[in-house]
Amino acid sequence: MREHRPVIALDFPSFEAVKEFLALFPAEESLYLKVGMELYYAAGPEIVSYLKALGHSVFLDLKLHDIPNTVKSAMKILSQLGVDMTNIHAAGGVEMMKAAREGLGSQAKLIAVTQLTSTSEAQMQEFQNIQTSLQESVIHYAKKTAEAGLDGVVCSAQEVQVIKQATNPDFICLTPGIRPAGVAVGDQKRVMTPADAYQIGSDYIVVGRPITQAEDPVAAYHAIKDEWTQDWN
């Protein structure tokens, strides 16, 4: 099922910065928030508890990648935080992904990273020594993710349709690199607008700087949300 709220990437260096940002929004507004490595390492698990206590949904974006037992144990801890979604690297293998699913349980969605949206095909081939196309690599990882029993993948919006064809229509495709038209793309190579992401079949979109660094973050959020949901029935 598609998520109507754009997921806001809380790319802040401290707990206080998050509090200042969230204070801009009405207290009754429930947001979907992404906590990444920078914030989690700066603020610790308490940041997740804080956001959940405010009534927000949380995507904990730590991209775990380790041996199966270690990932399973880590996921058991994360399950206690009440996160709504978290992720791992598909490159860790099917056994690692299965272990992660077992450790997390079924109360939260578990998705896998295929190829980072900052990765170009040339970079993948040169540094990862994967001698296929970028799309073929993404499809391979998506199939293995589905085989492992996960809920979906993180992928570029350009890859959503082929991933759903290769897996199933309900397989979640969460797409970062979403930018409204006219906004700088930053360090992401494969980007798309919210409206385009909807048309191509994305289930979740992640937006960071176009909201968090906007002159009016609340207005920017609602403009992106309106664009994302404008064609929903």
Curated annotation (Swiss-Prot):
Residues forming the catalytic site: K63
Keywords: Decarboxylase, Lyase, Pyrimidine biosynthesis
Catalytic activities: orotidine 5'-phosphate + H(+) = UMP + CO2
GO biological process, alphabetically ordered: 'de novo' pyrimidine nucleobase biosynthetic process; 'de novo' UMP biosynthetic process
Highest rank taxon of the organism: Bacteria
GO MF term set: orotidine-5'-phosphate decarboxylase activity
InterPro entries assigned: Aldolase_TIM, OMPdecase, OMPdecase_AS, OMPdecase_bac, OMPdeCOase_dom, RibuloseP-bd_barrel
Keyword Acetylation in record: no
Pfam families: OMPdecase (PF00215)
Coiled coil segments of this chain: none
EC code(s) of this entry: 4.1.1.23
Sites where the protein binds substrate: 11, 34, 61-70, 117, 179, 188, 208-209
Enzyme class: lyase
Pathway(s) annotated for this protein in UniProt: Pyrimidine metabolism; UMP biosynthesis via de novo pathway; UMP from orotate: step 2/2
PROSITE patterns: OMPDECASE
PANTHER family attached to this UniProt entry: OROTIDINE 5'-PHOSPHATE DECARBOXYLASE
Subunit structure: Homodimer.
Function: Catalyzes the decarboxylation of orotidine 5'-monophosphate (OMP) to uridine 5'-monophosphate (UMP).
UniProt similarity note: Belongs to the OMP decarboxylase family. Type 1 subfamily.
Protein name as annotated: Orotidine 5'-phosphate decarboxylase
Record organism: Streptococcus pneumoniae (strain 70585)
Gene for this chain: pyrF
